[in-house]
C-alpha cells in the first residue's frame, strides 16, 4: 500500500478529509519532499498547494495530487475551493504541528469543521515498508562511501 493510500484509508470514519500542514506528513503522503506547502487529501481528490519556487518540481514529482500554485491567491481561498469541490465537512488536522495562531487562522477561515487527528496521520510514518527500507539502505551506503 502506497503512503497516499494509507492516508485515504483514514477517511472511513470520523473525518472525510485530511489537512496536511507538516513537512513530514506532506513528504510521507506525496513521497516527495517540498519545503513549503499544504495538502488536502480526500477520497474525491487530493490537492497540493505550494508557491512558485516549488511549483515545477511539484508538478513533475507529485503523483496522485493536483498541484496548485498559491501565488497571488493564498492558501485559505484555495483550501476552501478544495473543501467545496470535494464536499468536505470534517477535516482532520495535525494539532502537534500547528501553532495556536495558525490553528486560529484555519478555524476562522476554513469552511469545514476541524478535528485533531495527529495521532492517526503520523501513526503510519513509524512503520516502514520494504521499498522504504531499501531507500534507507541505499542512502546509508552513499553516506558510508562519502566518509570512506
Language-model features, listed with the residues they occupy:
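Flexible, acidic/His-enriched mid-domain "rim/lid" segments that flank
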Residues: 2-4, 76-148
Amino acid at each position: 500500500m502506497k503512503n497516499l493510500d494509507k492516508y485515504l484509508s483514514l477517511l472511513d470514519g470520523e473525518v472525510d478529509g485530511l489537512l496536511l500542514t507538516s513537512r513530514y506528513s506532506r513528504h510521507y503522503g506525496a513521497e516527495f519532499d517540498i519545503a513549503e506547502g499544504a495538502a488536502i487529501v480526500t477520497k474525491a481528490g487530493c490537492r497540493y498547494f505550494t508557491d512558485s519556487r516549488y511549483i515545477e518540481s511539484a508538478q513533475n514529482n507529485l503523483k496522485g495530487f493536483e498541484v496548485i500554485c498559491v501565488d497571488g491567491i493564498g492558501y485559505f481561498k484555495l483550501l476552501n475551493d478544495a473543501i467545496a469541490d470535494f464536499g468536505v465537512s470534517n477535516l482532520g488536522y495535525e494539532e502537534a504541528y500547528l501553532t495556536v495562531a495558525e490553528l486560529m487562522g484555519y478555524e476562522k477561515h476554513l469552511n469545514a469543521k476541524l478535528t485533531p487527528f495527529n495521532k492517526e496521520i503520523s501513526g503510519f510514518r513509524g512503520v516502514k515498508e520494504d521499498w522504504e527500507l531499501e531507500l534507507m539502505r541505499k542512502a546509508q551506503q552513499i553516506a558510508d562511501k562519502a566518509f570512506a
